[in-house]
């Protein structure tokens, strides 16, 4: 009987996750995951997007209370907008809560002024993430007072499905968007592993409201998926002999280690990647003069790599028989324990 683990151990696994923040804000990030088996980019991208946009917890304003106003079809003296417009604007306020219990925050303004979210007195437990967001326009010598209830939740909750079944008279429930992720898009491109060029590279663009950073949001979404899928693993894995027989190889198993697993400087790593050097075996077959002819590769990078190779009793210019092996990816996985 074939080993069950061959169903997943023979698949290529992503070994690089890169997070690139946009210079103007920390709330937007580009996440690159590679390499993936063909088709897995679309599978993972779609699943991650759906979880990011639906299942993360966040905070939102769930109800408001304005003196002498009992429902959303009223008007507020001195306020240019009617109550329904004010509610629509309040729905756009992005909040962050440092506690899990509900909190009531208060707004008090005197006209003439443009009332913004930054005027709200939030106390220590609530933070306004978009303080310049406009709530309404207040006329001269007119005062506006308001209490706003903030809660923690997930997804989008309609006012008709509010957590509060019995709101006090005068308190108006509003639709609440708890999700801290504002947008998620993704695309899939080809990436190269060895001589194979049709593996998947998943590129995701994630924007949050600042309640969580994009990289944290992606991590939480991945954990949610992991927890949901765990139940499907309804079998016991067979204990396999992990003793690696290195004498079956015509070369050192260290040559099967990927160069991107080495602790190289960014410059050295990029030079090797651009020259299509994937494994240490690819690297040691090169001579020092070969390496120095590589674009942007200098003596400093050469010495750095020589020191690392020496730790494995390896050097440049080695004669490696039968390199590269046809099943190099499978061998690399099989002998992983011997060089880690």
Curated annotation (Swiss-Prot):
One of its GO terms (molecular function) is DNA-directed RNA polymerase activity. Its EC number is 2.7.7.6. GO terms for cellular component: cytoplasm; DNA-directed RNA polymerase complex. Keywords: DNA-directed RNA polymerase, Nucleotidyltransferase, Transcription, Transferase. It catalyses: RNA(n) + a ribonucleoside 5'-triphosphate = RNA(n+1) + diphosphate. Residues 251-340 are annotated as: Alpha C-terminal domain (alpha-CTD). DNA-dependent RNA polymerase catalyzes the transcription of DNA into RNA using the four ribonucleoside triphosphates as substrates. Belongs to the RNA polymerase alpha chain family. The N-terminal domain is essential for RNAP assembly and basal transcription, whereas the C-terminal domain is involved in interaction with transcriptional regulators and with upstream promoter elements. This is DNA-directed RNA polymerase subunit alpha. It comes from Rickettsia prowazekii (strain Madrid E). The lineage of its organism: Bacteria, Pseudomonadati, Pseudomonadota, Alphaproteobacteria, Rickettsiales. The gene is rpoA.
């Amino acid at each position: 009987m074939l080993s069950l683990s061959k169903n997943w151990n023979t698949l290529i696994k992503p070994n690089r996750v890169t997070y690139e923040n946009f210079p103007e804000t920390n709330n937007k990030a580009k996440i690159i995951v590679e390499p993936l088996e063909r088709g897995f980019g679309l599978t993972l991208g779609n699943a991650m997007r759906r979880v990011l946009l639906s299942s993360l917890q966040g905070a939102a304003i769930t109800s408001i209370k304005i003196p002498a106003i009992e429902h959303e079809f009223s008007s507020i003296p001195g306020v240019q907008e009617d109550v329904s417009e004010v509610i629509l604007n309040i729905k756009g306020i992005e909040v962050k809560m440092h506690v899990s219990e509900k909190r009531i925050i208060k707004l008090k303004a005197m006209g003439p002024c443009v009332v913004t979210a930054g005027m709200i007195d939030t106390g220590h437990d609530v933070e306004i993430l978009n303080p310049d967001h406009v709530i309404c326009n207040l006329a001269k010598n007119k005062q506006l007072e308001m209490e706003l209830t903030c809660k923690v939740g997930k997804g989008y909750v309609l006012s008709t499905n509010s957590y509060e079944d019995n709101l006090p008279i005068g308190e108006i429930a509003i639709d609440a968007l708890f999700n801290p992720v504002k947008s998620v898009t993704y695309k899939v491109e080809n990436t190269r592993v060895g001589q194979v060029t049709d593996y998947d590279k998943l590129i995701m663009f994630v924007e949050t409201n600042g309640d969580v950073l994009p990289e944290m949001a992606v991590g939480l979404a991945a954990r949610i998926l992991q927890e949901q899928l765990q139940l499907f693993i309804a079998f016991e894995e067979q204990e396999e002999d992990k003793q690696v027989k290195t004498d079956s190889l015509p070369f050192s198993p260290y040559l099967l280690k990927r160069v991107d697993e080495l602790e190289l400087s960014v410059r050295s790593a990029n030079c090797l990647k651009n020259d299509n050097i994937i494994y240490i075996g690819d690297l040691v077959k090169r001579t020092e003069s070969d390496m120095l002819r590589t674009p942007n590769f200098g003596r400093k990078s050469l010495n750095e790599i020589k020191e690392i190779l020496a730790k494995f009793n390896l050097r440049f210019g080695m004669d490696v028989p039968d390199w590269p092996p046809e099943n190099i990816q499978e061998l690399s996985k099989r002998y992983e324990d011997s060089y880690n």
